[in-house]
Amino acid sequence: MKPTRHIAWGALLGPALSACGPAPEGEELDLSSQEQGLEAGCTALSPSIASHSCLHANTSADHVAVTATSGLTASTPSLTGTHKQFDVTLPAGATGTVKFTPGTTGSWAFYLNKSITFTAKSGATTLSSALAQAVSTSCGLTNYTVYNLTAGTTYTLELGTASGNLVGVIPERVEDYNTRYYQDADGDAYGNNNVSILSACVPPAGYVTARYDCNDSNASINPGAAEIPGNSVDENCNGSLSN
């Protein structure tokens, strides 16, 4: 993940990237990262994505029943839309096939509620996953696999055998959950406005979400510190030496 400089482009921002997904912090958005795949060095997605997926897993109105086919056929169904849990019925004791066409280019995480094999294909080509991890959630999701996908391309998803021949699948576009993290060089839990990364992954050590540290080399100086009047030091970073 490459640090980026502060960019004061608040006026260029559009609305939140999804109706129920979190919007990244406005005035420092790195617009180019919204179209890139999963960044190098990402070892795990932010737990906030799984938490959001659980909202859909726990909401009956967000569940959509789909019956997979045995292999790709003319009747193979598509997982259409986002912010849904697709309850996919598989062929008895066999692998099931569904289709998925992303509306936006980027990294797509597929959260599952059973630990089964999960493969994405473009035509006859099996895609390499960008990331695959087990996950512990309160709603029963067990793992996710991330693929870098192109908008408008129809992919084939193959789901391995599952107990009860049923598995829940929740597709989430990873970039919709980008969060701005700031370098905290002095370890006081407040970061440097001018050194930050935009990521939907677990941040590297030394990066935090709080900012406005006016001296990131001194842990006693930050927005949460008590001001000491009369010492010519702005301890609480509010621009005043007296309060």
Predicted stretch roles:
Residues M1-G10:
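Bacterial N-terminal signal peptides that target proteins for export
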Residues A16-A19:
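C-terminal motif of bacterial Sec signal peptides marking the signal peptidase cleavage site
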Residues G21-P24, N238:
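Bacterial signal peptide processing site
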Residues G26-Q36, A40-S70, A120-A130, T145-N178:
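C-terminal edge strands of extracellular/lumenal beta-sandwich accessory domains
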Residues S75-W108, G140-Y147:
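Non-catalytic, beta-strand-enriched accessory regions in extracellular/secretory proteins
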Residues Q85-P91, S115-L141:
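Surface-exposed beta-strand/loop patches in noncatalytic accessory domains
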Residues P102, F110-K114, L159-T161:
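Non-cytosolic beta-sheet module surface loops
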Residues D176-N243:
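Membrane-associated feature with strongest affinity for ZDHHC
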